[in-house]
């Protein structure tokens, strides 16, 4: 429950002398104070309580936020911003499972979404399915401002029995792989809504039980730019975001490789509990081995086969999401969507399809990520449904 308190009655000209937090347990006060340091010395009539709520909601660390202004001091009146919070559960061992049109997937993750009390993210664990076994470790430190850059690291090892499908759903490639990947990047928040990052990415694939491929390696330097603006309306964090990422590198096949990806999202609240989401995403690779082809997630597509692979994909869609109820345990929502996607197929032609989707989500109030996601999408051109039910992690 969030409350806005009128501050018109406070003495004119009173300035903010302190931002006072109550209820912090794991979160370091120095971290959240830094988020709000611009309010120090601000005239109290210029304090935007809704903006403070949005800044804190965007951290994903608090289930309850109560902001008020307090006038203190008789001889020299000053204003204190009082913020009472209740922290979410951000550290937990998390078993998860997912069942989709492509089969079962499960695993276990040890997740800390507020490591060191500064919203550092530390995740480690394994993902298992009949066709793949993956171990992974990830760490991320967010960029706060120009003086405090961000840092992220990701690595994974997998043994996979993968088949690649073309647009029609036919198997065009099937092999057993041992793969490894690593990603390292640093980021700088140049403006409150604009972040730039540079890094490097490494991939390795050893195709087992065949001599057709040698062990494949590729390395690339990466650069990305992202824009994001959020606004809390009491039900959702309404977001407008865009990002662009490019990579350029070299492969073990002695050739220059590259690629580019983009995504954008515009959210509009129709009423407080109903929002529209216009989204788009796409990617292409240049000169990369077919083993490293893109999946449907690069185009934010739900209607394609999960085993489909391509070197070019672009998709756009529109979603309407409505929150049915909000209780102490969390929020339940339903959504309907429609998407269009175009891809470059294995036969060197471009093909497209479109179709509707629908589903529901459960966001638990006390944890920092979705708890249950159920969805289905229909590919009109192929007359085929794709569906997924996941518990613990949003796949």
Residue spans of the language-model regions?
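Bacterial N-terminal signal peptides
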Residues: 1-6
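Periplasmic polypeptide-binding modules associated with outer-membrane biogenesis and secretion
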Residues: 11-99, 109, 125-141, 204-206, ...
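Short, solvent-exposed loop/turn segments that connect beta-strands within catalytic domains
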Residues: 74-77, 272, 327-330, 366-368
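Gram-negative/organellar outer-membrane beta-barrel architecture
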Residues: 76, 84-234, 240, 294-301, ...
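Short, glycine/charged-rich beta-strand-loop motifs at protein surfaces that mediate ligand recognition
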Residues: 172, 344-350
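C-terminal outer-membrane beta-barrel translocator/porin domains of Gram-negative envelope proteins
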Residues: 222-338, 344-346, 376, 391-392
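Short glycine-rich, acidic/polar surface loops and turns
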Residues: 355-362
